[in-house]
């Protein structure tokens, strides 16, 4: 799990780096715009999320409601090389992390039904989508549904992975993908994948496997793969 409280002191540093959105101060609900041509930086977020992780035997013994199974995952660092920096990921490192997670989960890339991306509403979004396509070897026609939870709740720091993983297991449980809002004007470099971006709730009866990622800050990457649990 993870928790994040809003701090003017913490976010002032990001504002000084000019990575926060300033164009929608009067309309904050429109400010977080991942994958949008008019994205202008990310929006601070806060909150908390907890996932109780235990063995299948333990969960069944105590009669727990099982939401999903963790198939596998991976973490790595791009080494601050080839475009990687304190605030941006190395695309090759991102792709290695995705592929390593798929291998660890012992699945085929074609089994990924949906992606919960890092997608922060910065200039790195098109590069991230391209990395997903390359790592999963998916064409625009076969590209999974892709969404950004940050479009609705902003970008937390220590809690981002926990919050968005909770969203993943709930989507798997109920078989839907939540919208990536404020993306009416899809970035031109992502346009060929536009059909994979839900603008409203997308019901997906076939949704079984979802991959969640956190990329970027410090050039450190993490991916986890979840599968819906069938009772």
What is each stretch, according to the model?
Residues 97-105, 131, 135, 168-172:
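Stable alpha-helical structural segments in soluble proteins, enriched in small hydrophobic residues
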Residues 1-3, 65-73, 109-117, 143-151, ...:
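Beta-strand segments within the central parallel beta-sheet cores of soluble alpha/beta enzyme folds
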């Amino acid at each position: 799990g993870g928790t994040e409280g809003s701090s003017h002191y913490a976010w002032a540093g990001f504002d000084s780096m000019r990575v926060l959105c300033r164009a929608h101060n009067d309309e904050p609900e429109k400010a977080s715009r991942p994958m949008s041509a008019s994205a202008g930086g990310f929006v601070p977020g806060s909150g908390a999320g907890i996932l109780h992780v235990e063995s299948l035997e333990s969960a069944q013994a105590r009669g727990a409601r099982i939401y999903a199974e963790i198939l596998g995952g991976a973490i790595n660092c791009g080494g601050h090389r080839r475009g990687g920096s304190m605030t941006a990921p190395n695309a090759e490192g991102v792709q290695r992390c995705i592929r390593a997670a798929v291998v660890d989960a012992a699945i085929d890339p074609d089994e990924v039904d949906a992606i919960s991306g890092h997608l922060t509403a910065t200039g790195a979004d098109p590069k991230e989508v391209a990395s997903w396509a390359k790592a999963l070897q998916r064409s625009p026609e076969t590209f999974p549904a892709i969404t950004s939870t940050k479009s609705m709740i902003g970008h937390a720091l220590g809690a981002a992975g926990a919050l968005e993983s909770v969203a993943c297991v709930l989507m798997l449980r109920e078989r839907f993908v939540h919208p990536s809002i404020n993306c009416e004007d899809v970035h031109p470099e992502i346009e060929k994948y536009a059909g994979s971006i839900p603008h409203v709730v997308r019901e997906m009866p076939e949704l079984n496997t979802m991959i969640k990622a956190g990329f970027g800050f410090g050039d450190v990457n993490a991916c986890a793969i979840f599968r819906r649990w069938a009772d």
